[in-house]
């Protein structure tokens, strides 16, 4: 087995169903200005203590708020194993980086706050990684977020795409 195949196998195996995932209900602060949540968190965003500048909506459903200064960016994604989410990695990670740098709070969400939004958050955190071991950093971030949220990027195809871009291609 070559090095890339070994890394991919180990990463996918170690992020399997270690404990039964449960749907997160609370919004999670990921960095100073980037938050991860679900649809309900997004609907409550206008009255949140956090004064969001943006909401990144990754569901298939488009919505808007009345009497709110929150800018909603809709990037429709399907949560299934055939969706190519890697086409969004560069644009979304760049956007989240700008929000962090400019101190503009952003909520990233999908329906449950697990797969689509979790994958974009994981891609963002991996894109910021300056560590010499992307494999270990991936495992650290994945398990830390899963411990915090109860479920995090459970879609194996989404994990695979992140591993290919941010771990395998870095080695």
Curated annotation (Swiss-Prot):
<dbReference type="GO" id="GO:0004722">
    <property type="term" value="F:protein serine/threonine phosphatase activity"/>
</dbReference>
<keyword id="KW-0426">Late protein</keyword>
<dbReference type="GO" id="GO:0052170">
    <property type="term" value="P:symbiont-mediated suppression of host innate immune response"/>
</dbReference>
<keyword id="KW-1035">Host cytoplasm</keyword>
<feature type="active site" description="Phosphocysteine intermediate">
    <location>
        <position position="110"/>
    </location>
</feature>
<dbReference type="InterPro" id="IPR052103">
    <property type="entry name" value="Dual_spec_Phospatases"/>
</dbReference>
<keyword id="KW-0922">Interferon antiviral system evasion</keyword>
<dbReference type="GO" id="GO:0030430">
    <property type="term" value="C:host cell cytoplasm"/>
</dbReference>
<comment type="similarity">
    <text>Belongs to the protein-tyrosine phosphatase family. Non-receptor class dual specificity subfamily.</text>
</comment>
<feature type="domain" description="Tyrosine-protein phosphatase">
    <location>
        <begin position="23"/>
        <end position="171"/>
    </location>
</feature>
<keyword id="KW-1090">Inhibition of host innate immune response by virus</keyword>
<keyword id="KW-0945">Host-virus interaction</keyword>
<dbReference type="GO" id="GO:0039502">
    <property type="term" value="P:symbiont-mediated suppression of host type I interferon-mediated signaling pathway"/>
</dbReference>
<dbReference type="InterPro" id="IPR016130">
    <property type="entry name" value="Tyr_Pase_AS"/>
</dbReference>
<protein>
    <recommendedName>
        <fullName>Probable dual specificity protein phosphatase OPG106</fullName>
        <ecNumber>3.1.3.-</ecNumber>
        <ecNumber>3.1.3.48</ecNumber>
    </recommendedName>
</protein>
<keyword id="KW-1105">Inhibition of host STAT1 by virus</keyword>
<dbReference type="GO" id="GO:0044423">
    <property type="term" value="C:virion component"/>
</dbReference>
<dbReference type="Pfam" id="PF00782">
    <property type="entry name" value="DSPc"/>
</dbReference>
<dbReference type="GO" id="GO:0004725">
    <property type="term" value="F:protein tyrosine phosphatase activity"/>
</dbReference>
<dbReference type="InterPro" id="IPR000340">
    <property type="entry name" value="Dual-sp_phosphatase_cat-dom"/>
</dbReference>
<keyword id="KW-1114">Inhibition of host interferon signaling pathway by virus</keyword>
<dbReference type="InterPro" id="IPR000387">
    <property type="entry name" value="Tyr_Pase_dom"/>
</dbReference>
<dbReference type="InterPro" id="IPR029021">
    <property type="entry name" value="Prot-tyrosine_phosphatase-like"/>
</dbReference>
<comment type="subunit">
    <text>Homodimer.</text>
</comment>
<keyword id="KW-0904">Protein phosphatase</keyword>
<keyword id="KW-0899">Viral immunoevasion</keyword>
<comment type="function">
    <text>Serine/tyrosine phosphatase which down-regulates cellular antiviral response by dephosphorylating activated host STAT1 and blocking interferon (IFN)-stimulated innate immune responses. Dephosphorylates the OPG144 protein.</text>
</comment>
<dbReference type="GO" id="GO:0039563">
    <property type="term" value="P:symbiont-mediated suppression of host JAK-STAT cascade via inhibition of STAT1 activity"/>
</dbReference>
<keyword id="KW-0378">Hydrolase</keyword>
<dbReference type="InterPro" id="IPR020422">
    <property type="entry name" value="TYR_PHOSPHATASE_DUAL_dom"/>
</dbReference>
<dbReference type="InterPro" id="IPR003595">
    <property type="entry name" value="Tyr_Pase_cat"/>
</dbReference>
<keyword id="KW-0946">Virion</keyword>
């Amino acid at each position: 087995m070559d090095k890339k195949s070994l890394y991919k196998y180990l990463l996918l195996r170690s992020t399997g169903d270690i404990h039964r995932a449960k749907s997160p209900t609370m919004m999670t602060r990921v960095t100073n200005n980037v938050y991860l949540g679900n649809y309900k968190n997004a609907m409550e965003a206008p009255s949140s203590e956090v004064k969001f500048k943006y909401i990144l909506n990754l569901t298939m459903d488009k919505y808007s708020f009345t009497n709110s200064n929150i800018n909603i960016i809709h990037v429709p994604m399907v949560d299934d194993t055939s969706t190519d989410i890697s086409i969004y990695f560069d644009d979304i990670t760049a956007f989240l980086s700008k929000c962090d740098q400019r101190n503009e709070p952003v909520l990233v969400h999908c329906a449950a706050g697990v797969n689509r939004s979790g994958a974009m958050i994981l891609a963002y955190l991996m894109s910021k990684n300056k560590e010499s071991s992307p494999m270990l950093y991936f495992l650290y971030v994945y398990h830390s977020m899963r411990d915090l949220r109860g479920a995090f990027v459970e879609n194996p195809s989404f994990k695979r795409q992140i591993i290919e871009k941010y771990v395998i291609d870095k080695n």
